[in-house]
From Swiss-Prot:
Subunit structure and binding partners: Part of the 50S ribosomal subunit.
Main localization of the protein described in the UniProt heading: plastid
Pfam families: Ribosomal_L16 (PF00252)
Gene name of this polypeptide: rpl16
One Gene Ontology term from the biological process aspect of the record: mitochondrial translation
InterPro entries on file: Ribosomal_uL16, Ribosomal_uL16_bact-type, Ribosomal_uL16_CS, Ribosomal_uL16_dom, Ribosomal_uL16_sf
Entry's family note: Belongs to the universal ribosomal protein uL16 family.
One Gene Ontology MF term: rRNA binding
Compartments it resides in: Plastid
Name by which UniProt lists this protein: Large ribosomal subunit protein uL16c
Keyword tRNA-binding in annotation: no
A single cellular component GO annotation: mitochondrial large ribosomal subunit
Swiss-Prot/TrEMBL keywords: Plastid, Ribonucleoprotein, Ribosomal protein
Organism placement in taxonomy: Eukaryota, Viridiplantae, Streptophyta, Embryophyta, Tracheophyta
Length: 137
């Protein structure tokens, strides 16, 4: 599973997901992409599940790029703990995804294969997504 090797601080504020993605919203590496249509936190487990599903579906052909990285720690307090005594310990990592962000890219396969693979990966995601393709490559 993906997680940062080293961070400056162990804990982060939750923050809020306003607006559209201003970065990472264009296809850069491949020919096909999976684009987020809703804001959400996507966990490292979900990213990995989507990547595995796509790899299995595309079989030998094609290359896959994961365009998001989980760099935000989510803390959880133990069950039945009294208030106070600080913030909980980091339990898992998430990637903050805004609408328009490209989640995965793929190249080296036909459009039908890419669409089917992205469809399976999209079912692993907690948000609505759309299949997009680049006219240039």
């Amino acid at each position: 599973m993906l997680s940062p090797k080293k961070t400056r601080f162990r804990r982060q504020h939750r923050g809020r997901m306003k607006g559209l993605a201003s970065r990472g919203n264009h296809i850069s590496f491949g020919k096909y992409g999976l684009q987020a249509l809703e804001p959400a936190w996507i966990t490292s487990r979900q990213i990995e599940a989507g990547r595995r599903a796509m790899t299995r579906n595309a079989r030998r052909g094609g290359k896959i790029w994961v365009r998001i990285f989980p760099d935000k720690p989510v803390t959880i307090r133990p069950a039945e703990t009294r208030m106070g005594s600080g913030k909980g310990s980091p339990e898992f990592w998430v990637s903050v995804v805004k609408p328009g962000r490209i989640l995965y890219e793929m190249d080296g396969v036909t459009k039908n294969v890419a669409k089917r693979a992205f469809g399976i990966a999209a079912s692993k995601m907690p948000i609505r997504t759309q299949f997009i393709f680049s006219e240039i490559k």
